[in-house]
Curated annotation (Swiss-Prot):
Has three domains with a flexible linker between the domains II and III and assumes an 'L' shape. Domain III is highly mobile and contacts RuvB. Residues 1-64 are annotated as: Domain I. Belongs to the RuvA family. This is Holliday junction branch migration complex subunit RuvA. It comes from Methylobacillus flagellatus (strain ATCC 51484 / DSM 6875 / VKM B-1610 / KT). InterPro entries: DNA_helicase_Holl-junc_RuvA_I (IPR013849), Hlx-hairpin-Hlx_DNA-bd_motif (IPR003583), NA-bd_OB-fold (IPR012340), RuvA (IPR000085), RuvA_2-like (IPR010994), RuvA_C (IPR011114), RuvA_C_sf (IPR036267). The RuvA-RuvB-RuvC complex processes Holliday junction (HJ) DNA during genetic recombination and DNA repair, while the RuvA-RuvB complex plays an important role in the rescue of blocked DNA replication forks via replication fork reversal (RFR). RuvA specifically binds to HJ cruciform DNA, conferring on it an open structure. The RuvB hexamer acts as an ATP-dependent pump, pulling dsDNA into and through the RuvAB complex. HJ branch migration allows RuvC to scan DNA until it finds its consensus sequence, where it cleaves and resolves the cruciform DNA.
Length: 194
């Protein structure tokens, strides 16, 4: 399996890129979120990859972050979602937006993605609901969430009796580097205004 590519970016034409790794050019399909963060052609680039072998093709998908690749892998496990659909979802939604939609069980964001209908969106929400940790809806279960303070604030709000939707909305407004006590204080102030 090819897990990572490091080399010179030779071509980039959405959604494909070519990376020269010591004289060998690897063609990768990337989500638009990764594509927009790529350097100019001729510069060094590192992509985390997922190698997929099919009967008629061998395909390489590249990602700018481990979280994005992990989400792609989870999407592939959903019945009826292939690599093309998973890439379209990650091109249309950030990982955070997808996690938020799953946490709140909202099909609205998913059906805006080309190729994702109402039934597929509902299946995605059903099959992914246990795959995302409740830390503001931003991390996959089993990954190491960087926002433990947000998770603690969210858990505190839930323990105080706020529903998940209100608590998630309040936590999403907090700065990323906030302390837990300050986060709870600001969230309670925000929730008391509604």
């Amino acid at each position: 399996m090819i897990a990572r590519l490091s080399g010179i970016l030779v071509e980039k034409t959405p959604p494909q890129v070519v990376i020269d790794c010591h004289g060998v050019g690897y063609e990768c399909e990337v989500p638009m979120s990764t594509f927009y963060n790529l350097p100019a052609t001729g510069e060094k680039v590192v992509l985390l990859t997922q190698f997929i072998v099919r009967e008629d093709a061998q395909l390489l998908y590249g990602f700018g972050s481990d979280q994005e690749r992990a989400t792609f892998r989870q999407l592939l496990k959903v019945n009826g979602v292939g690599a093309k659909s998973a890439l379209a979802i990650l091109s249309g939604l950030s990982v955070d937006d997808l996690a938020q939609a799953v946490a709140l069980q909202e099909t609205g964001l998913l059906i805006k993605v080309p190729g994702i209908g109402k039934k597929t969106a509902e299946r995605l929400l059903l099959e992914l609901k246990d795959k995302f940790a409740i830390d503001g809806g931003t991390a996959l279960a089993g990954s190491n969430p960087a926002k433990s303070a947000s998770s603690d604030v969210l858990n505190a709000l839930l323990a105080l009796g706020y529903n998940e939707r209100e608590a998630l909305a309040a936590v999403k407004q907090l700065p990323a580097d906030i302390a837990v006590a300050e986060g709870i204080k600001l969230s309670l102030k925000s929730l008391s205004k509604t």
